[in-house]
Amino acid sequence: MNIRFYNAKILTMEEEKQYRIAEGELWVKGNTICYIGDGSDVATVCQGDEVILWDREIDAEGNLLMPGFKNAHTHTAMTFLRSYADDLPLQSWLTEQVFPREDQLVEDDIYWLDILGIMEYLTSGITSNFDMYFFPPKNAQASIDCGFRTVQTSGLNNFGGSVQELEENYLKVNDMGELASFIIGFHAEYTTSRELMEGVAALAQKYHSPVFLHNAETALEVKECKDRWGMTPTQLTDELGMYAYGGGGYHCVHMEEKDFEIFRKRGLTAVTNPASNLKLASGIAPVKRFLDEGIALAIGTDGPASNNCLDMFREMFLTTALAKVRENDAACVPAEEVLYMATTEGARCMGLSDCDRLAVGKKADLIMIDLCQPNMQPENNILKNIVYSGSKQNVAMTMVNGRILYERGVFDIGFDPKEVYAKANAVIRRMK
C-alpha cells in the first residue's frame, strides 16, 4: 500500500543521537519510507518520480510518528505460562514448572501461542522481536503470516536440540523471506555442555554470525560457572571463540571487570530485561556502567512467563528508574538514551539496520503515538513523556513493513483474536 501521513510530529532517531521532532509529512510507498519533510520541497525531492496514488491519507494531527520498538529479547510462545508459575526463584521456576510444561508442547501449539504474543507486541508498539524458543521455523512462520518482523535464535541446550538442528534452522529461517531472519545462539552456559558450546562457536565462525545467550542473569549462575570452569560465562564463551563476529548477552546483571572489557573489545551488546530481573529477584543490571564503557545496550521484555507483560513502555521506565536507584544518581541514564536503546540500538543488535530509524529508503516499521491523552499533556518534553508517563494506551497505530497491523484497538493480521485466545487456553488446559 501507499500511505501518506500529514500534519504529523515526526521523531526520526538520527544516527548522531539528535532527538529532534519535526513537523510535516511522512510517505510510505510499498514497504519503504520515500519522503519525510514539511511538504514544501516535494517537487524538488520527488522530481522525475512517478506520481504516487495514495491508498490512504492519514491526518496525524496530535500524533507522533516514530520508529517502532525492537524487543531485543523474548520467548514469545511462553504466553501459555503467563501467570501460571509465579513467585518462584529462577532455578525452581525453570526446573519445577517451566521445563516440564515445555516438554509437552508440539509445533502447532507454538504457532498459535506465538500469534498471541505478536498481538500483544503490536498493542505495545513493538515492530520486531529477537525470539528464542523451540521450533524457530514455526515461530518465524507465525510472524510472517501476521506480517510481523522477527529475528529468531536458538535455545539449544543439553535437554534438546543439536548443533546440526541449529544449523538447519539457521539456513531455513534465513531463507523464509524479508520478515524473518536467524542469528546463532544457545540457551545459557549452565544448561549447555562444553561440547555443544564449541559446536555453536564453530557454526558462528562458519557463517560469520553473531552469538547471543542468557548471560550472568543471576549471581548463582556466575558462581557455579566459576566453580566449573574458573571463569565467568562471558569469559568462557569468549575463550571458546564465540564472538569473532559479535553478538552479546541477555540480562547481563552480574558482570565482573573482565566481562566489561570483553564486551567492549568484541563490540558486544548487552540486552537488559528489567521487569523480569525484578520479578525473579535476579538483580539490577549495571546499565550506567555499560553506557560509560561505550558498550551497546538494547532492551527486551523477556518472556511472558517471567515478566508477565510484553510492554516496552514499562521496560523503558524501569531501565532508567532502576539505574538511578542503583547509582543513587537521579541524573544518570536519561529518558532519551533509553528511547534510543529501545529503538535504534535494538535494531542494530538484531541485524535490522534497514529499519533502525525513520529515513528515506528505510523500511516502514513505525508507530503512531497519540499525544492527545491526559498522560501525554502538557507537551513540555514529548520524549520524556513517552518514557516516564507513556503507556500502551498511547499506541494509536503499529505499522510493519509498510502494512498497518494494529490501529486503535483493531488488528489486521488475518486472524480472529477470539480464535487465538481459545487456542492458547486449550494448550494450557491440556497440561493441567
Model-identified regions with their sequence ranges:
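Divalent metal-coordination and catalytic microenvironments
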Residues: 8, 26, 31, 62, ...
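Active-site gating loops and adjacent loop-to-helix segments of metal-dependent hydrolytic enzymes
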Residues: 80-112, 146-154, 174, 219-246, ...
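Metal-coordinating catalytic core of metallo-dependent amide/deamination hydrolases
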Residues: 138-258
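Histidine/acidic-residue-rich catalytic or RNA/ligand-binding cores of hydrolases
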Residues: 163, 219-231, 259-263, 281-290, ...
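His/Asp/Glu-enriched, well-ordered alpha-helical/loop segment
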Residues: 239-246, 288-371, 389-390
